[in-house]
Amino acid sequence: QSERFEQQMQGQDFSHDERFLSQAA
């Protein structure tokens, strides 16, 4: 899952990822 998560992060903007990370955390 870690590898897939990293790939998705690269694909999407970091701004949007920050929000996703918030939910994940």
UniProtKB/Swiss-Prot annotation:
This is Antifungal protein 1. Belongs to the 2S seed storage albumins family. Residues 1-25 are annotated as: Disordered. Residues 14-25 have a biased composition (Basic and acidic residues). The keyword Lyase does not apply. It comes from the Eukaryota. It comes from Passiflora edulis. Expressed in seed (at protein level). Not detected in pulp, stems and leaves. Keywords: Antimicrobial, Fungicide, Plant defense. Has strong antifungal activity against T.harzianum, F.oxysporum and A.fumigatus with IC(50) values of 32 ug/ml, 34 ug/ml and 40 ug/ml, restectively. Lacks antifungal activity against R.solani, P.brasiliensis and C.albicans. GO terms for biological process: defense response to fungus; killing of cells of another organism.
